[in-house]
Amino acid sequence: MINDRETIDLERLSLPHGAPAVVWQISDSPVAYPEAVAAMEVRAAAIAAGEAPELVWLLEHPPLYTSGTSAKPADLLDPRFPMYPTGRGGQITYHGPGQRVAYVMLDLKRRRPDVRAYVAGLEQWIIATLEHFNVKGERREDRVGVWVKRPDKGPGHEDKIAAIGVRLKRWVSFHGIAINVEPDLTHFSAIVPCGVSDPRYGVTSLVDLGLPVTMQDVDVALRAAFEQVFGPTR
């Protein structure tokens, strides 16, 4: 079956030539989740008011779980880390060291006020990033995020390598994506990641796939791929 998100025209997700470039910011130290959410709320409001430029914020969190608007309490199997309810879409996910989180604050009213197109754009951004490391990421119609096939684990097995969760206020996006670079994958065993309980579907990372990449390598690839989909950064 063709995933209908693959057929969405992404061309209009970028701003016209000459528009201000997106600010690209990287935090070197882990950022507490409540601090990150508060900062996103402030920045998104400022973008909506025309008082601040768009922003992509790359960071890592200390170990924690977040629950989206579709989360089921039963999907938290072992509450070994703090759990934070959040207004993003999706279910329960894990964030922690070794995972590159990218919070994306874009004015979709100026770009394209279409949530499905925006999510497809985030997926394409991740897929293009993975291509830098010769990893084939794929969309799935019934599973949000980006997946890689794992024939080494058996027929039909796939692992999730990146998660997506978004929220919009006044057509400004926040929250965003998370790519597994080298997290402790055992931390995912305490939840049903994103509500997917089928044993054929697991979680992986770039390092788990045998790629000796660093967070800095991923950041370079993320920036190049972002500019392909959403336009220039500064």
From Swiss-Prot:
What biological-process terms (Gene Ontology) are attached? protein modification process
State the UniProt keywords alphabetically. Acyltransferase, Cytoplasm, Transferase
Which residues are tagged with the site Lowers pKa of active site Cys? K160
Gene Ontology CC, one term? cytoplasm
Pfam families according to UniProt: LplA-B_cat (PF21948)
Alphabetically, the GO molecular function entries are: lipoyl(octanoyl) transferase activity
Q: Where is the BPL/LPL catalytic domain?
A: 50-234
Q: Supply the EC number(s).
A: 2.3.1.181
Looking up Gene3D superfamilies in the UniProt record yields: Bira Bifunctional Protein, Domain 2 (3.30.930.10)
Instruction: Specify the pathway.
Output: Protein modification; protein lipoylation via endogenous pathway; protein N(6)-(lipoyl)lysine from octanoyl-[acyl-carrier-protein]: step 1/2
Where, per UniProt, does this protein localize? Answer: Cytoplasm
Please indicate if the UniProt record lists Transcription as a keyword. no
Concerning its family, UniProt says:
Belongs to the LipB family.
Biological role: Catalyzes the transfer of endogenously produced octanoic acid from octanoyl-acyl-carrier-protein onto the lipoyl domains of lipoate-dependent enzymes. Lipoyl-ACP can also act as a substrate although octanoyl-ACP is likely to be the physiological substrate.
Its recorded name reads Octanoyltransferase
